[in-house]
Each structure stands twice: as C-alpha cells, then as structure tokens.
UniProtKB/Swiss-Prot annotation:
<protein>
    <recommendedName>
        <fullName>UPF0349 protein GTNG_2908</fullName>
    </recommendedName>
</protein>
<dbReference type="InterPro" id="IPR009910">
    <property type="entry name" value="DUF1450"/>
</dbReference>
<dbReference type="InterPro" id="IPR022916">
    <property type="entry name" value="UPF0349"/>
</dbReference>
<dbReference type="Pfam" id="PF07293">
    <property type="entry name" value="DUF1450"/>
</dbReference>
<comment type="similarity">
    <text>Belongs to the UPF0349 family.</text>
</comment>
C-alpha cells in the first residue's frame, strides 16, 4: 500500500511546524519525511507548511496545518 507522503523542512520545523509533524507521525497511514530544505524559502519564512504528495499546504498554527493536511488528503485522494 502506498502511503501519502508528508514532507517537512527542518527550518520550518524550528519555526513551529514541529508540533504538527509530531501529531502526524502518530498516524500509521502517513509517511513523514524531514529534509534540510524544500526550496520554499520565502514561503517558509512566512508560514508553517508541509508538502503533501508534492503539493504545498500551509497553516497559521500547527493545529491548523494538521487540519489543512488532512483536508487536502480528503480532497485529493491518491487513487
């Protein structure tokens, strides 16, 4: 089974998305990956974000980011 891939930038984790990643890591149906940089530097400086199956998803708070990630997955099923 192919799992959705959620990618985080280490710089953004330090800016606050760490909590979102920790919440998402508890979900066995997601593949969570950390990278040193995802090349979204301008947006990374402005908001919490993750790439969800390669698409940019953001949130004002870690909780909102988690909510937006799950919403994105519901609206964009892999199959």
């Amino acid at each position: 089974m192919i799992l959705p891939i959620i990618e985080f930038c280490i710089s953004n984790l330090a800016s606050g998305s760490q909590k979102a990643m920790e919440i998402l890591e508890k979900d066995p149906n997601l593949d969570i990956i950390e990278y040193s940089c995802l090349s979204y530097c301008t947006r990374c400086a402005d908001t919490l974000f993750a790439l969800v199956n390669g698409e940019f998803v953001s949130g004002e708070t870690p909780e909102q980011l988690v909510e937006n990630i799950y919403r994105h997955l519901e609206e964009n099923p892999m199959f």
